[in-house]
Amino acid sequence: MGKLFVISAPSGTGKTSLIQAVLEDPVASNTYLGISYTTRKARPKEEDGVSYFFVSQMSFMEKVKNNDFLEYAEVFGNFYGTPKDWVLSVLSKKENVLLELDIQGALQVKKAFPEAKTVFIIPPSYEDLTKRLESRDQDSKTEIAKRLKEARNEVNIGKDFDQVIVNDDFDAALEDLKQFMFTSEGVTNERSEIIKNSLDLLLD
């Protein structure tokens, strides 16, 4: 069996960019990104079957009824689900699966697959996260406030994941992610100390 990795993070933390970068590295040649089903509308540049499988709520609920999802969750009014058969098929070929999920989904997968390795990515500070959300220019002030409140709740849960990574420096965070996923040594002691300090700051 291959390995199942689950990566979660508050919105605006740079999770998607880190995942794209790790998958482009030769070390991840046998690691595949899971594509979720979702009922939300596609954003600009998102493609059906590449970014997500975009479906109606009726179609999604039919899949829930048929037990087609490894996990599913409602996030900000939209549903997301991970196709079970695809994940099991890839793992059975001794290849790895990387799932990019919200924290609810990550917890569901860990419960169903205790051997899954969970990663939670944090910002260096809430001030930094606020700036990132504002610079995306895709959310209203009300939406940003909602996401920041949600981020605080998520950090309280994500602190107990198998590995926490702080995206204070993109290259360093990418190296931490690769170390955790593909080496037996894991994250270096120096970076572990930085991660611990950042987490303490967010939990204070």
Please place each PLM-identified region on the residue numbering.
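Conserved phosphate-donor/acceptor-positioning beta-strand/loop module used by diverse small-molecule
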Residues: 97-102, 111-135, 166-169
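The conserved Walker
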Residues: 9-11
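ATP-dependent small-molecule kinase phosphotransfer cores
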Residues: 36-97, 104-107
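Walker A/P-loop
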Residues: 16
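Post-Walker A helix-loop "phosphate-sensing" segment adjacent to the P-loop in P-loop NTPases
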Residues: 24-33
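NTP-dependent small-molecule kinase module
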Residues: 138-139, 156-204
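Pre-Walker A (Motif I) flank of P-loop NTPase domains
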Residues: 1-5
